Amino acid sequence: MNIFISNLNFRVRKEDLIALFQNYGEITGARIIVDKETRRSKGYGFVEMSEEDGMKAIAALNGTEHQGRIINVAVGQEREPKAL
């Protein structure tokens, strides 16, 4: 399951997401989205884990404080490929 996390502190790293979500199950992937030009965080990211564990994590973490900000945690949506 793909989990979308928004309103992240701009200093949050991939390792921070892993530490936050690992209490809910095995993580198969994590990434912070960064600006292509500046390489600065855009304040959101994704975590991959099983559907059962992901639903537990969403229920437990959505609306909680992490590094000074209230985070939003939800099921991630698949994006349509960009047209060439």
How would you describe each model-predicted region?
Residues 1-23, 28-40, 44, 48-84:
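Intrinsically disordered, low-complexity RNA-binding regions enriched in Gly/Arg/Ser/Tyr
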